From Swiss-Prot:
Catalytic activity of the protein: ATP + H2O = ADP + phosphate + H(+)
Biased composition annotated in UniProt, kind: Pro residues: 1-23, 231-249, 259-286, 302-327
Regulation: Binding to RNAs including lncRNA Evf2 leads to inhibition of SMARCA4 ATPase and chromatin remodeling activities.
Protein name: SWI/SNF-related matrix-associated actin-dependent regulator of chromatin subfamily A member 4
Description of how the protein assembles with itself and partners: Component of the multiprotein chromatin-remodeling complexes SWI/SNF: SWI/SNF-A (BAF), SWI/SNF-B (PBAF) and related complexes. The canonical complex contains a catalytic subunit (either SMARCA4/BRG1/BAF190A or SMARCA2/BRM/BAF190B) and at least SMARCE1, ACTL6A/BAF53, SMARCC1/BAF155, SMARCC2/BAF170, and SMARCB1/SNF5/BAF47. Other subunits specific to each of the complexes may also be present permitting several possible developmental- and tissue-specific combinations.
Start-end of Basic and acidic residues biased regions: 74-89, 1429-1438, 1600-1610
Intervals of motif DEGH box: 881-884
Skewed-composition ranges (Basic residues): 579-588, 1611-1621
Annotated localization: Nucleus
Summary of the tissues where the protein is detected: Colocalizes with ZEB1 in E-cadherin-negative cells from established lines, and stroma of normal colon as well as in de-differentiated epithelial cells at the invasion front of colorectal carcinomas (at protein level).
The HSA domain, residue ranges: 460-532
Binding-site residues for ATP, renumbered to this chain: 779-786
Effect ascribed to mutating residue 1540 to A: Abolishes binding to 'Lys-15'-acetylated histone H3
Length: 1647
């Protein structure tokens, strides 16, 4: 067998070499012996190595060296593999290879395997037979004849002669050949498991030749055998050659190609003389070793290939009789016949080799044989496909072509697979480790190990099966999960669609319902006028001229809206052009080498460090519209003075072109677009002729057409698609031309999901941004405007890549709430809360300049004050919270924002409804869009007098007014979004409000009656030195005093002090149950609050007055209720912490005490579900805002609002007035009227009328015996008030509800109601068991005698007071009730920033008091001294007795000796100098830097102190001993050591000063001990003298000893009351012990 080349591939097959050395597929020289690995050699004698007498030639018989022939074979093989058989060079090389033989041109001899090859190509020739992989259409295919030396065909050449010519004499004799053949046949039969016949056994042993062999022998020529014959005998193989060795196996006898015909009787296949079809004969090379030619045997019958296309490895040969006979193949006529194999006859008898034991089958050889068979079949199939006839059907030819191309791609596919396998090969220990078998001997496998191996294999199979099942299960689970997700997704989409459909249907239903109501209203109006016989009004509605008038009005309105539409379009175009220009400019700046400076508003370069003080500010003349710019315009620093000198001018809003471009660029743009049409700004200035509605120019058809168009367009909704569907480019569609659908919030927003209406609001805000517009988000309070703003910012940051900076301007009270919402919803947004002291704000400047922030939160004041810092930043967006503050166009905030700040995008947030006052509305629109809404006068003039052009003076009727209002709303619609709670009420829990009437205590009734009748407040007479006898005090602002009495009578200082003395309390403060017994509202709270706490309801308690909140705190402390307080004095940084503490889920505080004005704005207190309004506000919107702190988005529980109202009091009238105002506001807003003109003067007149008529009602009801009073019986309602609102309430409404009714109001469900009833029962039982039981409200028998006065007595006291006033002895001090602000807003802000508010207020107060004392000393020097003393002393004590933190009273002076020692010690410490340098150590300790200069010191040091403060305390007698002084000095040194680093100069100086103080004190104390008793007596005298001096300073008169002792005893019992204000003597750095000592008074120290 020959080893064929790899078909269509170049890789030789590995395998053991058949010879002594490696050999290529076609060996280049003769082998010295038979193939040792051949199966044939195992069955017969094998010749030994060649003798020395036969040298190995180095050159082929044709004259070609073997090396040259081998080098020629390589390119031939590569050309053959690459399919280059048609190349002429390939034919030339092939011809040279064919001539290497007995004549020139024959190639090298084949290997021993090639002797047996019956289906594989040689390297030189073409296909040897039909199964050759080389295509038959190659250059060597076709009919070829044996050629002679000259290349001529040898037609008559004898095959045997050719064999003899080509082969040398064989070294085997005849017997050896017979024996070899017998051995081969026996091996084949044994391989098939067949028994050996006897004659074959004899022939194998060489005893007797096989039958038939003798007859065949003489016919064989002795010299050689054909190269293509299936010679099975082992011959001398070719010599060793370079290249890899062929496989170590030999093909069994009879294994030819798959399509080879069976041989005939003579051993030659029929129809094949000597050569198989498809290729020329492959002769053996002729050489000197003539005896090395191998004998051949008769070829056996062929085994046909298996029909499955997958041949079995090495099928066994069958005997000639048993082998199947294949039909002979027809041979082309041009092919020469193959000569019969010749067996050479040798005379010399060789030595018989003994039979070796045959080796077993090698599985590697079987696999290789299988591969070779497959390759042979593939090659044969390729040949068949190439030789298909041309008459084949089209589809068959297509299939054949596909198959042929696929087979030709086999090697490429195999090579690709090998490369992939090499790349994907996994590293294993078996491949990378050393060969273990080379280092140890093989172990004999035992049965146990085989079983273990079998067991492991079984386990491995089970594990593989388990993994396969698991993987399959996971795959199935993933499919099921995907199906589930798929269904869920589509279910959610379907749900969203259904919700949207429902919302659309609801919207259309609501719209249809409203339209129906409107039609009914118009119909009713017509019927009403008809029934009232108002013929003129009825004709107005139905007359044709009315329609013409309406048509004219609509036409004029449409023209105005069209003008606005054009302005909007031009505004958007200008914005787009500006963006392009900015990009172009930016690109140009990037290409430029240097950086150009920024351009200021006047087109000049603007330095970064400039304060814009020398820049001109553009101004505009209000009436003419003339604009001054450049050098004509005033400078920024002289703007205010210039505006005063030039009335009629105002600051022009910054246009967009000024923000980024210069004047030169604007001129270039004007040159590029010289013919751009200027839009008409005002509809009244249109040149278009508008027909007179009274003339006949307007036909009925035209009027009807105009009306129809207006009807289609009058209800223009927020949908752009609807307008486009009607074919109208509507106003809203133009404004919101660019649409972007927003379905979800930004990923930057966490910790919550927006509601659906909030998503719609976000989409509207994004639409404003996309269309370069600004707008107003005017959702009702509590619907989440803050959250929607944060959503807009995060959406722009994520989707639009706009990271800011965003400027948000908010009130100071809501700044902390904004910061809290940002931290909660968008923690990734970098925000800056720009507030605090100037030093704190300056700390933000580096961050602002670097731009490392997204959002800046600040207040209105800092926007104005720090405009030199904040105006330098180019803001992307400006957002103004509580935007209704901008309604005044001339306010400073609006002017500063328009003049100094650059923000192309602006957004206003407001929760209050927009008032329909046209100037205010225009101011907002002008601030947002100055290019669209330019002139206020025209705007107001047109909407107020639309018929001014026609000369008519007729007022608009109702239908025309509604039309204009709708047109006005349409103007606003693209820029305004407002949703009410009722529109989203499905997402909010219910809110129920109850008004709970409260009764008055006897004390309240008495005080209220006298204050209402005479405007006086009863006193105990102590202010006139008539203590206990009673008196009166006339107070201003009677309504405020009545409200105080209704809230709590202890809000009057002297009432509480007198009652505390009457009830036996010390200190002038009433405690305990008498706190709530004195007020009906407090008594009601005492019943309600325990129930709410028991059921875990959190409460918001809103009050109008902070002094009332202080009394409330005392009550909460008495009942043990945990509470929080927030009012106007609460610092902004503390508010956020209070909100967070109250809103925590497990918070122990269930009451939040808030003032309505400070705590009712912008706070989120949704954890509370009960709102108690202790006293109603004049402005009903304030109370609504307070309610919205709890009733807002996020509230889960039902909200109960309890409004407390004292029965038959001024509070009922205030509540009625507030309700009336709220109703009027609703009517105005709904109807759109523009005549809402109420003033504070009218309100005061209205209240005065209330009080006057209430007094008459009170007297009349008292005379008739009725206890209820109502002013509405006789008081006519003020102008415009609906009389129905002021009808007297029913008797049931005046009744105070009982416990069961109150429980029904506050209970959410039946279980709570039952619990409340049981709590009331337990409370009543506990009160009944108390032996000292008192009624829950004070009764008249508990009141002191001085307060129970009849009207005549009160009248007499009032007259006496008036007489005293006339004679200059008025006892009422205006300082008691001071409603004026002692500081201006600017001073107050400055004091807040520097932290010196209390000191400044005290200074102002002292200045006022000093001026007053000066006036008193000038005017009242003739008054008696005794009464003046007592009155002044009482007033002094009363002045200090107010609620709040008690201040330090003026202490009694220290002994002069002690003061002297303290001063001496401190002076010695201060004057101490360093001995080495002469430096005064205390220089830096004398006075600390201020908080403004060194804020970090005050953050670290809790109690700062310096020598200046120590000296001041010595002067004020704060130190009672040297130990107190030592504490402060040591504290001073410790503060220095805490703040400064160890080892620093100040640190070391403080240590030295400590030792100096200690040594000086010891020295002075030793000197003090040496003094005698005489000095002590002198000290006592001096002390008494100093005391008397201090007393004389107080009362201006020196008192006697007895009076002085009594006064001192009285002062020792007196405690400062609740409401006294702090004085600057008590500082924040005082210790708690010192403050407690200050509170305790001066009684014990004065002795």
């Amino acid at each position: 067998m020959s080893t064929p080349d790899p078909p269509l591939g170049g890789t030789p097959r590995p395998g053991p070499s058949p010879g002594p050395g490696p050999s290529p597929g076609a060996m280049l020289g003769p082998s010295p012996g038979p193939s040792p690995g051949s199966a044939h050699s195992m069955m017969g004698p094998s010749p030994g190595p060649p003798s020395a007498g036969h040298p190995i030639p180095t050159q082929g018989p044709g004259g070609y060296p073997q090396d040259n022939m081998h080098q020629m074979h390589k390119p031939m093989e590569s050309m053959h593999e690459k399919g280059m058989s048609d190349d002429p060079r390939y034919n030339q090389m092939k011809g040279m290879g064919m001539r290497s033989g007995g004549h020139a041109g024959m190639g090298p001899p084949p290997s021993p395997m090639d002797q047996h090859s019956q289906g594989y190509p040689s390297p030189l020739g073409g296909s040897e037979h039909a199964s050759s992989p080389v295509p038959a259409s190659g250059p060597s295919s076709g009919p070829q004849m044996s050629s002679g030396p000259g290349g001529a065909p040898l037609d008559g050449a004898d095959p045997q002669a050719l064999g003899q010519q080509n082969r040398g004499p064989t070294p085997f004799n005849q017997n050896q050949l017979h024996q070899l053949r017998a051995q081969i046949m026996a091996y084949k039969m044994l391989a098939r498991g067949q028994p050996l016949p006897d004659h074959l056994q004899m022939a194998v042993q060489g005893k007797r030749p096989m039958p038939g062999m003798q007859q065949q022998m003489p016919t064989l020529p002795p010299p050689s055998v054909s190269a293509t014959g299936p010679g099975p005998g082992p011959g001398p193989g070719p010599g060793p050659g370079p290249g890899p060795a062929p496989p170590n196996y030999s093909r069994p006898h009879g294994m030819g190609g798959p399509n080879m015909p069976p041989p005939g009787p003579s051993g030659v296949p029929p129809g094949m003389p000597g050569q198989p079809p498809g290729g020329p004969p492959k002769p053996w090379p002729e050489g000197p070793m003539a005896n090395a030619a191998a004998p051949t045997s008769t070829p056996q019958k062929l085994i046909p290939p298996q029909p499955t296309g997958r041949p079995s490895p090495a099928p066994p040969a069958v005997p000639p009789a048993a082998s199947p006979v294949m039909p002979p193949q027809t041979q082309s006529p041009g092919q020469p016949a193959q000569p019969a194999p010749m067996v050479p006859l040798h005379q010399k008898q060789s030595r018989i080799t003994p039979i070796q034991k045959p080796r077993g089958l090698d599985p590697v050889e079987i696999l290789q044989e299988r591969e070779y068979r497959l390759q042979a079949r593939i090659a044969h199939r390729i040949q068949e496909l190439e030789n298909l006839p041309g008459s084949l059907a089209g589809d068959l030819r297509t299939k054949a072509t596909i198959e042929l191309k696929a087979l030709r791609l086999l090697n490429f596919q195999r090579q690709l697979r090998q490369e992939v396998v090499v790349c994907m090969r996994r590293d294993t220990a078996l491949e990378t480790a050393l060969n273990a078998k080379a280092y140890k001997r093989s172990k004999r496998q035992s049965l146990r190990e085989a079983r273990i191996t079998e067991k492991l294999e079984k386990q491995q199979k089970i594990e593989q099966e388990r993994k396969r099942r698991q993987k399959h299960q996971e795959y199935l689970n993933s499919i099921l999960q995907h199906a589930k997700d798929f269904k869920e997704y589509h279910r959610s989409v379907t749900g969203k669609i259904q919700k949207l459909t429902k919302a659309v249907a609801t919207y259309h239903a609501n719209t249809e319902r409203e339209q129906k109501k409107e039609n009914e209203r118009i119909e009713k109006e017509r019927m009403r006028r008809l029934m009232a016989e108002d013929e003129e009004g009825y004709r107005k509605l139905i007359d044709q001229k009315k329609d013409k008038r309406l048509a004219y009005l609509l036409q004029q309105t449409d023209e105005y809206v069209a003008n606005l539409t054009e302005l909007v379009r031009q505004h958007k175009a200008a914005q787009v052009a500006k963006e392009k220009k900015k990009k172009k400019k930016k690109k140009k700046a990037e290409n430029a080498e240097g950086q150009t400076p920024a351009i200021g508003p006047d087109g000049e370069p603007l330095d970064e460090t400039s304060q814009m003080s020398d820049l001109p500010v553009k101004v505009i003349h209000v009436e003419s519209g003339k604009i001054l710019t450049g050098t004509d315009a005033p400078k920024a620093g002289q703007l205010e003075a210039w505006l005063e000198m030039n009335p009629g001018y105002e600051v022009a809003p910054r246009s967009d072109s000024e923000e980024s471009g210069s004047e030169e660029e604007e001129e270039e743009e004007e040159e590029e677009q010289p013919q751009a049409a200027q839009p008409p700004t005002l509809p009244v200035e249109e040149k278009k002729k508008i027909p007179d509605p009274d003339s006949d120019d307007v036909s009925e058809v035209d009027a009807r057409h105009i009306i129809e168009n207006a009807k289609q367009d009058v209800d223009d909704e927020y949908g752009v698609s609807q307008a486009l569907a009607r074919g109208l480019q509507s106003y809203y569609a133009v404004a919101h031309a660019v649409t972007e659908r927003v379905d979800k919030q930004s990923a930057l927003m966490v910790n919550g999901v927006l509601k659906q209406y909030q998503i719609k609001g976000l989409e509207w805000l994004v639409s404003l941004y996309n269309n370069n517009l600004n707008g107003i988000l005017a959702d009702e309070m509590g619907l989440g405007k803050t959250i929607q703003t944060i959503a807009l910012i995060t959406y722009l940051m994520e989707h639009k890549r706009i990271n800011g900076p965003f400027l948000i301007i908010v009130p100071l009270s809501t700044l902390s709430n904004w910061a809290y919402e940002f931290d909660k919803w968008a923690p990734s947004v970098v925000k800056v809360s720009y507030k605090g002291s100037p030093a704190a704000r300056r700390a933000f400047v580096p961050q602002l300049r670097s731009g490392k922030f997204n959002v800046l939160l600040t207040t209105y004041e800092y926007i104005i004050k720090d405009k030199h810092i904040l105006a330098k930043i180019r803001w992307k967006y400006m957002i103004v919270d509580e935007g209704h503050r901008m309604k005044n166009h001339h306010c400073k905030l609006t002017q500063v924002l328009n003049t100094h700040y650059v923000a192309p995008r602006r957004l206003l947030l407001t929760g209050t409804p927009l008032q329909n006052k046209l100037p205010e509305l225009w101011a907002l629109l002008n601030f947002l869009l100055p290019t669209i809404f330019k002139s206020c006068s025209t705007f107001e003039q047109w909407f107020n007098a639309p018929f001014a052009m026609t000369g008519e003076k007729v007022d608009l009727n109702e239908e025309e007014t509604i039309l204009i209002i709708r047109r006005l709303h349409k103007v606003l619609r693209p820029f305004l979004l407002r949703r009410l709670k009722k529109e989203v009420e499905a997402q909010l829990p219910e809110k129920v409000e109850y008004v709970i009437k409260c009764d008055m205590s006897a004390l309240q009734r008495v005080l209220y009656r006298h204050m209402q009748a005479k405007g006086v407040l009863l006193t105990d007479g102590s202010e006139k030195d008539k203590k206990g006898k009673g008196g009166t005090k006339t107070l201003m602002n009677t309504i405020m005093q009545l409200r105080k009495i209704c809230n709590h009578p202890y809000m009057f200082q002297h009432i509480e002090e007198s009652f505390s003395e009457h009830l036996g309390f010390t200190g002038g403060i009433v405690q305990g149950l008498d706190l709530y017994r004195a007020s009906g509202k407090f008594e009601l709270l005492d019943r309600i609050l325990p129930k709410l706490r028991a059921t875990n309801h959190k409460v918001l308690l809103f009050c109008q007055m902070t002094s009332l909140m202080t009394i409330m705190e005392d009550y909460f402390a008495y009942r043990g209720f945990k509470y929080l307080r927030l009012d106007g004095t609460t610092k902004a940084e503390d508010r956020g912490m209070l909100l967070k503490t109250f809103n925590e889920p497990g918070s122990e505080y269930f009451i939040f005490l808030l003032s309505t004005r400070a705590g009712g704005l912008g706070l989120n207190l949704q954890s509370a579900d009960t709102v108690i309004i202790f006293d109603s506000d004049w402005n009903p919107h304030q109370d609504l805002q307070a309610q919205d702190r709890a009733h807002r988005i996020g509230q889960q529980n039902e909200v109960r609002v309890l409004r407390l109202c004292t029965v038959n009091s001024v509070e009922e009238k205030i509540l009625a007035a507030a309700k009336y105002k709220l109703n009027v506001d609703q009517k105005v807003i709904q109807a759109g009227m523009f005549d809402q003109k109420s003033s504070s003067h009218e309100r005061r007149a209205f209240l005065q009328a209330i009080l006057e008529h209430e007094e008459q009602d009170e007297s009349r009801h008292c005379s008739t015996g009725s206890g209820s009073a109502s002013f509405a019986h006789t008081a006519p309602p003020p102008a415009g008030v609906n009389p129905d609102l002021e009808e007297p309430p029913l008797k049931e409404e005046d009744e105070v509800p009982d416990d069961e009714t109150v429980n029904q109001m506050i209970a959410r469900h039946e279980e709570e109601f039952d619990l409340f009833m049981r709590m009331d029962l337990d409370r009543r039982r506990e009160e009944a068991r108390n032996p000292k039981r008192k009624p829950r409200l004070m009764e008249e028998d508990e009141l002191p005698s001085w307060i129970i006065k009849d009207d005549a007595e009160v009248e007499r006291l009032t007259c006496e007071e008036e007489e005293e006033k006339m004679f200059g002895r008025g006892s009422r001090h205006r300082k008691e009730v001071d409603y004026s602000d002692s500081l201006t807003e600017k001073q107050w802000l400055k004091a807040i920033e520097e932290g010196t508010l209390e000191e400044i207020e005290e200074e102002v107060r002292q200045k006022k008091s000093s001026r007053k004392r000066k006036r008193d000393s000038d005017a009242g020097s003739s008054t008696p001294t005794t009464s003046t003393r007592s009155r002044d002393k009482d007033d002094e004590s009363k002045k200090q007795k107010k609620r709040g933190r008690p201040p330090a009273e003026k202490l009694s002076p220290n002994p002069p000796n002690l003061t002297k020692k303290m001063k001496k010690i401190v002076d010695a410490v201060i004057k101490y100098k360093d001995s080495s340098s002469g430096r005064q150590l205390s220089e830096v300790f004398i006075q600390l830097p201020s908080r403004k200069e060194l804020p970090e010191y005050y953050e670290l040091i809790r109690k700062p102190v310096d020598f200046k403060k120590i000296k001041e305390r010595i002067r004020n007698h704060k130190y009672r001993s040297l130990n107190d002084l030592e504490k402060d000095v040591m504290l001073l040194c410790q503060n220095a050591q805490t703040f400064n680093l160890e080892g620093s100069l100040i640190y070391e100086d403080s240590i030295v000063l400590q030792s100096v103080f200690t040594s000086v004190r010891q020295k002075i104390e030793k000197e003090d001990d040496s003094e005698g008793e005489e000095s002590e007596e002198e000290e006592e005298g001096e002390e008494e003298g100093s005391e008397s001096e201090s007393r004389s300073v107080k009362v201006k008169i020196k008192l006697g000893r007895k009076e002085k002792a009594q006064d001192r005893l009285k002062g020792g019992r007196r405690r400062p009351s609740r409401g006294s204000r702090a004085k600057p003597v008590v500082s924040d750095d005082d210790s708690e012990e010192e403050q407690e000592e200050d509170r305790s008074g001066s009684g014990s120290e004065e002795d």
